[in-house]
Each structure stands twice: as structure tokens, then as C-alpha cells.
């Protein structure tokens, strides 16, 4: 995929949930988008910073509610500053 391929970004404090969503998105949208998955807030913000520096568009941010030290809403606030054009949503898992 070209470096400018838009990104669907997934982050969840539960690595299993993050990877399951990543796999689902990859099956459905993997030909048109690059799927990036993280499970920690600091790693997620670092990945988003790198994408911003490289001017890679982020089309969608799917963010879990609890990122082990940061809320999903707080993460979205930081992410919005780097990628204001991205569609932003939160996710939750119900057992």
C-alpha cells in the first residue's frame, strides 16, 4: 500500500478487543485502508503523531473507553488536534 493510503485507527485498553476489531476491519476494508491498532494510550498517541508528521490521512478513529491511564474521550481530544479531519467514535464491549 502507498504511504498515503488512509488509515483506520483502532485503540482499546483490552488488546483482545482491539485486535478483534482490527481483524474485522481488515477483512472488510483492508484493500482501501491501512488498519493501525494499538492497546496503550502513549503508543497510540505516538503512532498518531508519526502519521501526522508523514501527512498520512486518518479517516477513522475507533477508541475504547478505558485506555489504561487515559479515558477514551481524553485520547480523542489529543487525536483531534493531530487529525481534525478524522471521524471519531468510541467503542465499548459488553460481556
PLM region spans:
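Active-site residues of response regulator receiver
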Residues: 59-65
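Hydrophobic/aromatic residues positioned on beta-strands within the core alpha/beta folds
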Residues: 63, 88-93
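Short acidic, S/G/P-rich loop/turn micro-motifs used as interaction or catalytic elements
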Residues: 14-16, 66-70, 95
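Non-catalytic signal-transmission and effector/linker regions of two-component phosphorelay proteins
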Residues: 1-34, 49-57, 81
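Short amphipathic alpha-helix used as the core "switch/output" element in two-component signaling
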Residues: 46-49, 66, 72-87
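Cofactor-binding loop segments of dinucleotide-utilizing enzymes, especially the Rossmann-like FAD-
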Residues: 13, 40, 93
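Conserved Asp/Asn-Gly motif in the active-site loop of CheY-like receiver
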Residues: 35-42
Amino acid at each position: 500500500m502507498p504511504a498515503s493510503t488512509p488509515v483506520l485507527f483502532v485503540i482499546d485498553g483490552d488488546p483482545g478487543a482491539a485486535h478483534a476489531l482490527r481483524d474485522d476491519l481488515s477483512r472488510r476494508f483492508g484493500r482501501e485502508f491501512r488498519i493501525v491498532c494499538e492497546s496503550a494510550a502513549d503508543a497510540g498517541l505516538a503512532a498518531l503523531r508519526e502519521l501526522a508528521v508523514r501527512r498520512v490521512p486518518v479517516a477513522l478513529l475507533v477508541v475504547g473507553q478505558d485506555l489504561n491511564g487515559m479515558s477514551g474521550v481524553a485520547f480523542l481530544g489529543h487525536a483531534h488536534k493531530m487529525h481534525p479531519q478524522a471521524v471519531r467514535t468510541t467503542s465499548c464491549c459488553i460481556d
